[in-house]
């Protein structure tokens, strides 16, 4: 189960 890239938004 990979983390959603869309939810991995940099600051």
From Swiss-Prot:
- Which superkingdom is the protein from? Eukaryota
Where in the cell?
A: Secreted
What biological process terms from GO does the record include? regulation of blood pressure
Q: Which coarse location class describes where this protein primarily resides?
A: secreted
Presence of keyword Repressor: no
Report whether DNA-binding shows up as a keyword of the record: no
Q: Which residues carry this modification: Pyrrolidone carboxylic acid?
A: 1
Q: In which tissues is it expressed?
A: Expressed by the venom gland.
Citing just one GO molecular function, the answer is:
toxin activity
Where is it found, in Gene Ontology cellular component terms? extracellular region
What's in the keyword line of the UniProt record?
Hypotensive agent, Metalloenzyme inhibitor, Metalloprotease inhibitor, Protease inhibitor, Pyrrolidone carboxylic acid, Secreted, Toxin
- Family of this protein: Belongs to the bradykinin-potentiating peptide family.
Free-text function comment from the UniProt entry: This peptide both inhibits the activity of the angiotensin-converting enzyme (ACE) and enhances the action of bradykinin by inhibiting the peptidases that inactivate it. It acts as an indirect hypotensive agent.
Q: What is this protein called?
A: Bradykinin-potentiating peptide 11
């Amino acid at each position: 189960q990979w983390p959603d890239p869309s939810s991995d938004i940099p600051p």
